[in-house]
A protein has these predicted regions:
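Active-site phosphate/pyrophosphate- and oxyanion-stabilizing loops and adjacent acidic/basic residues
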Residues: 23
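Short N-terminal binding/cap micro-motifs at the start of the first secondary-structure element
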Residues: 15-18
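Conserved beta-strand segments of alpha/beta enzyme cores
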Residues: 5, 32-34, 101
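S-adenosyl-L-methionine/SAH cofactor-binding core of RNA-modifying enzymes
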Residues: 27-92, 96
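Cys/His-rich short segments
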Residues: 1-3
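A structural signal for short, well-ordered beta-strand segments and their strand-loop junctions
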Residues: 8, 58, 79, 103-104
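Residue-level signal for short, function-critical loop segments
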Residues: 10-12
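C-terminal folded domains that constitute the principal catalytic or ligand-binding module
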Residues: 76, 85, 89, 93-173
Length: 173
């Protein structure tokens, strides 16, 4: 297993949305994931220090004809946890995010997430992005656990309803 850290840079509106899938990531990954509120005027100092130290990349979509990114040497991934519209704004208004290495993932198919309007055609929700990232870094067991939780989240008849997250053992496998 490859040891990875996920930082969810979260827009303030996401903290109260029942449709936010970042909470699933925090629940399944435990100490391997953190959530930091995004603030336009005060970048998170600790995150800036980690970016400066290296091994950090922003997971952010590129053009559809870009090859999948090489993850060699990366152990810490930043994901903007917000709507696609807000994610673009956050990226544009955060010079430190524009300077960090940017990677894009090539998902095997379309997003299964349909709980929000105005979704980007080729975009993934936060949980789906982390699932693909975990798979790409060899963390298959944790990816499967997160996928199971995500599928239960989007199909309430087969598990907890939207916004209902049952506690689980949070450990990377």
């Amino acid at each position: 297993m490859n040891d990875v850290k996920i930082t969810l840079l979260t827009h303030s509106k996401e903290f109260t949305k029942r449709s936010n899938t970042g909470r699933l990531v925090l629940d399944i990954l435990g100490v391997r994931a953190e959530q930091i509120p995004w603030e336009r005027t005060s970048p998170p100092v600790r995150l800036l220090e980690e970016i400066e130290a290296g091994g950090v990349a922003l997971v952010y979509p590129g053009s559809s004809d870009e090859p999948e990114s090489d993850l060699t040497g990366l152990s810490h991934f930043i994901i903007i946890d917000s709507t696609w519209h807000e994610a673009r704004k956050i990226h544009q208004k955060s010079p430190y995010l524009q300077m960090v290495r940017r990677i894009s993932l090539k998902p095997p198919g379309k997003s299964r997430y349909n709980l929000r309007k105005n979704q980007k055609e080729s975009g993934l929700c936060t949980a789906e992005c982390v699932i693909e990232l975990l798979r790409s870094t060899g963390n298959m067991t944790t990816a499967e656990r997160l996928q199971e939780r995500f599928l239960a989240f989007i199909r309430p008849e087969k598990g907890p309803g939207v916004g209902e997250i049952r506690p689980t053992q949070s450990a990377m496998s």
